[in-house]
UniProtKB/Swiss-Prot annotation:
Catalytic activity: tRNA(Gly) + glycine + ATP = glycyl-tRNA(Gly) + AMP + diphosphate
Principal location class: cytoplasm
Subcellular location: Cytoplasm
Protein source organism: Klebsiella pneumoniae subsp. pneumoniae (strain ATCC 700721 / MGH 78578)
Protein name: Glycine--tRNA ligase beta subunit
Amino acid sequence: MSENTFLVEIGTEELPPKALRSLAESFAANVTAELDNAGLAHGKVEWFAAPRRLALKVANLAAAQADREVEKRGPAIAQAFDAEGKPSKAAEGWARGCGITVDQAERLTTDKGEWLLYRAHVKGESTEALLPNMIASSLAKLPIPKLMRWGASDVHFVRPVHTVTLLLGDKVIPATILGIPSDRVIRGHRFMGEPEFTIDHADQYPQILLERGKVIADYEQRKAKIKADAQEAARKIGGQADLSESLLEEVTSLVEWPVVLTAKFEEKFLAVPSEALVYTMKGDQKYFPVYDNAGKLLPNFIFVANIESKDPQQIISGNEKVVRPRLADAEFFFNTDRKKRLEDNLPRLETVLFQQQLGTLRDKTDRIQALAGWIAEQIGADVNHATRAGLLSKCDLMTNMVFEFTDTQGVMGMHYARHDGEAEDVAVALNEQYQPRFAGDALPSNPVACAVAIADKMDTLAGIFGIGQHPKGDKDPFALRRAALGVLRIIVEKNLDLDLQTLTEEAVRLYGEKLTNANVVDDVIDFMLGRFRAWYQDEGYGVDTIQAVLARRPTRPADFDARMKAVSHFRTLEESSALAAANKRVSNILAKSDETLNDIVHASVLKEAAEIKLAGNLVVLRDKLQPYFAAGRYQDALIELAALREPVDEFFENVMVNAEDKDVRINRLTLLSKLRELFLQVADISLLQ
């Protein structure tokens, strides 16, 4: 066995399942950084995580830091001694800091002078001496939002700690971590294997824990086993398990010895919308639903036990008994809610505040209704259906089902609207009004749904900015960043002809006198353009490309996107660098001039061949490109403008812009301003690097 394998395991009470992976990864990253900063050579750092433990295993860890030579330069000789050759206070202070006397110092001579010099051979500290503080420091830096204190001690950690194992090879490293003395004792599964045992060597981990403790400490191995076993269990009943990544991660963090089992529920519950059943199975019980090959929910579910029982049927029956009342509740709520129309919930919206200064949910509903109709008119959607969907948009929030199962908002509105005989695009809009809910989420599928989704988000943006409660730092209680990005994605990806200026003005107008921020329209637009910056950076666009387009402040998102793609393509052209530099030069020249320019370039004042050539090219391109600009064909326009490289280069090589003759000078400045105006029709390419 290798004598330089290092193991640390922190044995705790059950750790927060949703934080387990991040805790383990952060622990590994922190320890790796500590080792690197200390100059300790090491091999692979592996992390392990289970509900009651965090562990790291470091391969090939050096026994000590490498020895090193230390040099510390002192004062120059001229300042180190007085006229009588006695050491100055500066020299004596420096020597004390080095642990020597001045006469023990060496001298360093260079072409710039002579200095006192201290040289020392520093022996590296042993790894054994360094590790305790490294581990303590790494644990203290873990991302723990809320610490616990237990017993009578002042020790704080995410959960109470029971064991600390620190092994370097076969040797226990003496230390007290989180109030617990280090040892070689490890605790196994609560109900299987050995409850407690000793580990002789770091290399035995995690195999010894698997064999004697019945714990799979390897997180990824445990996760892969759950996934494979669940897929196989679903296949056996002719279905496919819904193994969403977030739930799979959570279940992996809840069990030490996963045993996958299959259970069932009564088929009568399938009459309830599947979303409600799935919500309670996944959200409350941490079960995996099962669907047939057509995507229809089956009356089965898969769950993961944390014990290998001699009578698994008893565990299965227990879980079936647990889930049945929840499904029965969903069935009851569904049947009760359908006894009245969705629209009948409108008066109850008056009892729920949207925001104290902005009114109730009924007030918000009225604004969404009006704004959705206005948007529908702009994008060619059915105005009547959009206003109807806007009116019903929040009614399902007052139903029993959504009150009990909050994540079913929207989707239950869709089911109840269908039951009431509403138009299909109205029903779908009630579900899709919240889309996209997160990055990469699906967008609303029809124009009516797009209108309602945009209206809902714009109403929130206008209202919250209108009372001066915009996001600050990482605090965004009204999810305004998500709302803004959602609006932009819908408009761009659905290619809707909407202008943020008029859209925001309409959203603000519907608030009447409630808003107090006089600059609300500009604030909302600036905020949304800022979301564009983050979006396109995530898409891989260069910051300077984004800046070039933002400089024009285009307020039509689809138009903004077209400009981004055009500038990105322009950068691939051979002429782009020269023209970007030329535009920067033109911008600087014009900025330094305070003279009033002409409205047009006067051909009669042009003298040099190069300026005549450039002016001629600009006239031709101006006429040719106007239809391109009007149609948003920015990429084609920039390809045409790339042909200006040669005449622009010739102009700067052969023409003196700041001529002594005022008329000639102003005419040349006007010519350059017309050149810049053409490029600015697309973007400010002078900002390209």
